[in-house]
A protein has these predicted regions:
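A cross-family phosphate/adenosyl-ligand binding-site feature
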Residues: 2-129, 135-201
């Protein structure tokens, strides 16, 4: 009698992308555009607010963005695959991440699939990156961010870099997206790596 074949423990090349209603939806769009060229299976969930912000800030329509993902999940579908810990993924990134979404994730009191999927990633000890897009922050926000860091999330505010001497808004977006993907162990050609500056006298 043959022994049962052991289950594979290899994590699928599968990533959850959450887009909330904060300003900066273009970062989420660009990330999907980049990942579409890779072997990574992307699972997208956009909040209703994200769809509104997208139309206001960019020339994209929600259907254009959904076409970039491997799989789409309605924000109200709390029974989706990504709402279960048994659905293995590399992790999740919420980009941009609104203060409301951040707060729901920190408390575990979730109202949509964006925050529910993030909560699942945390409880399963997978990588969760939150690209916060808000300023200024009051003490309550900062305490919530501290809680998120303590429970395992990577708090990565969207902050542009200038050491790479960007020549356009696209350069800034691409570099930021590349750095966010770095946090998930995904290598791209988007980041100009710092190799040290001139020595001081």
């Amino acid at each position: 009698m043959k022994e049962p074949r052991p289950m594979s423990t290899k994590t699928p090349r599968r990533l959850v992308i959450g887009i909330s209603g904060a300003s900066g939806t273009i970062y989420g769009v660009r990330m999907l555009e980049i990942l579409k060229k890779t072997d990574i299976e992307t699972h997208l969930v956009m909040s209703k607010s994200a769809e509104m912000t997208l139309v206001y800030e960019t020339s994209y329509k929600p259907k254009d963005v959904r076409a970039l993902a491997s799989v789409n999940h309605p924000a109200a579908d709390i029974g989706a695959s990504i709402s279960s810990g048994s659905f293995a993924t590399m992790g999740m990134i919420v980009v941009p991440c609104s203060i409301r979404t951040m707060s729901e994730i920190a408390t575990g009191v979730t109202s949509s699939l964006v925050s529910r999927a993030a909560d699942v990633v945390l409880k399963e000890k997978r990588r969760l990156v939150l690209a916060i897009r808000e300023t200024p922050l009051h003490v309550g926000h900062l305490r919530t961010l501290t809680t998120l860091a303590e429970i395992g999330a990577v708090v990565a505010p969207i902050v542009p870099a200038f050491y790479n001497k960007p020549k356009s808004v696209d350069d800034i977006i691409n570099h930021t997206v590349g750095r966010l993907l770095d946090l998930l162990g995904i290598e791209t050609k988007l980041v100009k790596r710092w190799e040290g500056g001139p020595a001081e006298d």
